[in-house]
């Protein structure tokens, strides 16, 4: 995960100061890419400890099509609480767009079910794409999608994934995003009887919040450790039937947690 540390260095050295919606302010660079070979291990940042439970449950929540934080809270995950309304609702965010995009004809489109079946039917397709950026519903979302689209690519029996992100909280958010899309790629690869290939991140406004700068500098003093491995204990009937206990991260030996405030 040295490439992640190099991105932190890039922002600290080359970032421009920008004001932002949260009022905190950022150091920002534009247009960056990271690549991870999933054959080399599961890309969990090791220079600080990540809350794996939150990463797994959030992805399962997305795949359920759920947009209320109740399921997350019941499973000890609070990462979406700051944006939810008094009833726990977040509007038509990721889960709604992934599982029930509203078409012009009034019908809903399950993009996840479609892309899994299309990978099986037509792995050479250049349309293996899922989007969460529904312009017609952005104003109804408590937080418009930061990671707004992802695309799959099949070659030599391996499934690769590239996701696009308009806004990147590099210290707190990006390590979660990397692990989440790695997990999704492993799950879909298993469902399609493929091995895993590359994971590619493409970011637009890639930033460090000004109240994360010292934490980033501390992280840069730490040496990366070997990547863990992901074990999926069973193959469920569909992409929607995975459970938390199906996943085991083996050999994760991170440096201690580095706390930082969330910019809301």
Curated annotation (Swiss-Prot):
Pathway assignment: Pyrimidine metabolism; dTTP biosynthesis
Q: Which UniProt keywords apply?
A: Cytoplasm, Methyltransferase, Nucleotide biosynthesis, Transferase
Catalytic EC class = transferase
The question of whether Lipoprotein is a record keyword is answered with no
Q: Where in the cell is it found?
A: Cytoplasm
One GO MF annotation is: thymidylate synthase activity
Q: Which reaction does it catalyse?
A: dUMP + (6R)-5,10-methylene-5,6,7,8-tetrahydrofolate = 7,8-dihydrofolate + dTMP
Q: Name one Pfam family in it.
A: Thymidylat_synt
Quote the Gene3D superfamilies the UniProt record gives.
Thymidylate synthase/dCMP hydroxymethylase domain
Show the InterPro entries listed in the entry: Thymidate_synth/dCMP_Mease (IPR045097), Thymidate_synth/dCMP_Mease_dom (IPR023451), Thymidate_synth/dCMP_Mease_sf (IPR036926), Thymidylate_synthase (IPR000398), Thymidylate_synthase_AS (IPR020940)
Q: Which residues bind (6R)-5,10-methylene-5,6,7,8-tetrahydrofolate?
A: 51, 169, 263
Q: Which GO terms describe its biological process?
A: dTMP biosynthetic process; dTTP biosynthetic process; methylation
* Disulphide linkage map: none
Per UniProt, where does dUMP bind?
21, 126-127, 166-169, 177, 207-209
Give GO cellular component annotations, separated by semicolons: cytosol
Q: What does this protein do?
A: Catalyzes the reductive methylation of 2'-deoxyuridine-5'-monophosphate (dUMP) to 2'-deoxythymidine-5'-monophosphate (dTMP) while utilizing 5,10-methylenetetrahydrofolate (mTHF) as the methyl donor and reductant in the reaction, yielding dihydrofolate (DHF) as a by-product. This enzymatic reaction provides an intracellular de novo source of dTMP, an essential precursor for DNA biosynthesis.
Family indicated by similarity:
Belongs to the thymidylate synthase family. Bacterial-type ThyA subfamily.
Cite the PANTHER family for this sequence: THYMIDYLATE SYNTHASE (PTHR11548:SF9), THYMIDYLATE SYNTHASE 1 (PTHR11548)
UniProt-recorded name of the protein = Thymidylate synthase
Originating species: Geobacillus kaustophilus (strain HTA426)
Gene this protein is translated from:
thyA
